[in-house]
Regions:
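C-terminal catalytic/motor cores of large multi-domain enzyme assemblies
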Residues: 1-274
């Protein structure tokens, strides 16, 4: 399958809100404040850290390992229908605790909120859209060609909202249920995660009784070429466990995604396969 759109698999994770609410309340008693967004991103970071094959991408029918872990998400500058939005990319090395993730997210939201705030991507797009239509089409055709051959300039990759490990959409924040987000053929995004709003559902308590409760559903769209079915299944189970037990995210772990560490793993694998 040469394309990302015809290699897309879909899955959902139903997370009991009482687990999340209990964790948030317990941490609030200690003076630490977390949101569902913090838990979701921290769980994604830890998932990539422990399931490192997920941090790969396919270009030109070849699979590549990433040197970094980058999560992107859209930020509405003002919560109004006609307000502009931007895309923010946050870098991790896989070692982060939920405290580290929360602080990085808070800084990213604060730096990119406000109707008069423009980040580097906004400034670049403003200049790009001033080009004549024919020149813009030519520029984009060159960019797409370079992307297909994995030779796109590093400065453009750094700016691009389509070149990342994972793209997250916080639909809960606009009171919308989860979706299965479409994939982009352009770029390298291998996983889309859409967090929906809470909704009432029947749940089973510790006494094995069916009781009313709340569930939040997370929709995932994945490029199946980066790992096999068993690896994906185990990864999804691990992700669901992290979302149900956020206390697992309180401590840091070893960094996994730097150029040196990725190359070391690659060299070790090549040596083992000789």
């Amino acid at each position: 399958m040469p394309h990302r759109w015809d290699s897309a698999n879909y899955a959902r994770a139903d997370v009991r809100c009482d687990y999340l609410d209990r964790f948030i309340a317990n941490q609030a008693e200690k003076g630490e404040h977390f949101t569902y967004n913090d838990i979701l991103i921290a769980a994604i970071v830890r998932m990539y850290s422990e399931r490192i094959q997920m941090n790969r991408f396919v270009v030109g029918n070849k699979i590549y390992d990433r040197y970094d872990l980058t999560i992107a998400f859209a930020v509405k500058k003002v919560l109004k229908d006609n307000a502009s939005e931007t895309v923010v990319k946050v870098n991790f090395d896989g070692s982060e605790s939920i405290f580290d993730v929360r602080d990085k997210l808070k800084a990213a939201f604060e730096d990119n909120s406000g109707s008069k705030v423009n980040n580097d991507l906004d400034l670049f797009m403003n200049k790009l859209l001033k080009l004549p239509a024919w020149l813009l089409r030519f520029f984009m055709s060159c960019v797409r060609w370079a992307d297909r051959h994995n030779i796109l300039a590093g400065s453009l990759v750094e700016l691009s909202p389509f070149h990342n490990s994972c793209f997250v959409t916080f639909l809960k924040s606009i009171k919308c249920d989860f979706i299965y987000h479409h994939v982009y053929e352009f770029g390298t995004t291998g996983l889309f995660v859409a967090m929906g709003k809470e909704k009432k559902a029947a749940i089973v308590n510790e006494a094995n009784e069916i009781i009313p409760g709340k569930v939040m559903t997370v929709g995932l769209t994945m490029d199946e070429r980066i790992a096999d079915g068993l690896y994906y299944a185990n990864t999804l189970r691990y992700f669901t466990t992290l979302m149900s037990r956020p206390e697992m995210l309180l401590k840091r772990t070893e960094p996994k995604f730097t150029k040196e560490l990725v190359n070391e793993r690659h060299d070790r694998l090549m040596e083992e396969n000789r």
